[in-house]
Amino acid sequence: MFQISNIVVLVSKLIVKSRMLFYKLISSSETFSLFVITSGTAKFKRGFSGYYTNVLLSRIGKINSEIYYKKVCKLVGIFENQAIKDSYSWKYYSNIGILWHSTGDISKSLKSWYKYLESKEFYILEKGLDKFNIRIINPYPLASTIGNVGHLDGFLKLVELGVISKQKLIMPLPENSAIKFCNEHFVHNYLSNYIEIIKVKELPTVIRKKIEPLTQFLCGPLRLQGRIYPYNHTALSNASKLWELENRKPLFELNTEDLLFGREILARLGLPKDAWYVCLHIRDDSFKGSESFRDSKLHSYKIAIESIASRGGWIIRMGIKATPVEPDYNFPNFIDYANSEFRNSRMDVFLASQCIFFLGTSSGLYTLALTFGRPILLTNYAPMSSAHLKSTDYILPRLVKKRGHKTASPLNVILTAPYSLICWPGMEQYLGVEMIENSPEDIAAAVEEMFRSLEGKLSNHELESYDHIRKITERYETLPGGYGDSMICRIPAFFTKKYS
């Protein structure tokens, strides 16, 4: 027999599916969709506005660029009119910010995010919600993508630094919810040290509406010491910079139980005792589908893998449902943990927290290593506007090749808007460029530079190159919406010299 709790979960799922099906039917007609956004209840208009924004985003690169831009302008106009009428106006400004971003118009996007935060703060003060002195952390972003761990890590650091006012952080977890975090172990055993996770019954609509403005949008704008940072990644870069200036330790440290657990599994995976390893995570289309500007191929990392192995290191491949290693690939000291029986969220935390460094791509699993303060080298990276690692970490960006050109554009192009903003499938086509995958040789050279950094053997030329790139990113505003902010992490010196 079904328990009441099972029935509640089933009904909740059916309601969500029914609503999404209804939205899908409405959105099949553009005229009807725009009519619906201006009609009906305020709550329905807000919900459908967000859905239809994603519908339009899914068409970028698939329709003529001029037509797409006109559609964005039309939708933005409608959203702005609705924002004037709705006390929850920030809901519309977030959609407007996303839409302008998709066109590469960062100036208009930043203005929208600025309005988002101002209107939300005004509402909180007007309704006296600030007296509760709490911030709600929505659990769902941590279920949708592991990369949001990085946003939360930066936010928590800003709170600990006192740059953001210290408030009680609460994550309400609905009872009987079907929610499944991308890493259950990290949330319940580490994140819970900073955020109170409370089980709650289904909240009445009137209460949900009251506390919704207190919910922290992890990817949204932040106010730091009185200044609004409309672009979240710029604020997070500041978090890393300030954290290092105060010489603080990572927020998280692996506990003894997990350390013993991880060592036992390592032995069963075949790693020799006391051997060191590098975590390798390469985004492909096996888990969340294809995104050409972020996907990479395992064989491009062969030289880098051989380089690590030649030093006596091991390579542990991370991920979920990763593309199986082809039979003719004979990688030395290589463990395909991603496709092993031992893969689980607890072991993911152990591996990311104990690696000598994390070799990743434009996919969020590296943020686990970030929270534990491990060295990071990201390859085939985009967008550069989201670079918010530590000052000793490395990013090897994808270059862009403009339509009709035979060779890639210089490095400074990918550091400049709109190309530094490419973060949706289709933006390449819209902007008339192709993102170029890093060559195996460049990936291997970046790994060698990381080793020199870890061993304290960097040359003066390399150190000067890092400073030069930081000045370049400040000049080009690679991190948008800041106050003379530069990217604090490194681009490998050989790459800067080769492609400038």
Kindly give the residue locations of the regions a language model identified:
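N-terminal targeting/anchoring "stem" of glycan-biosynthesis enzymes
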Residues: 2-500
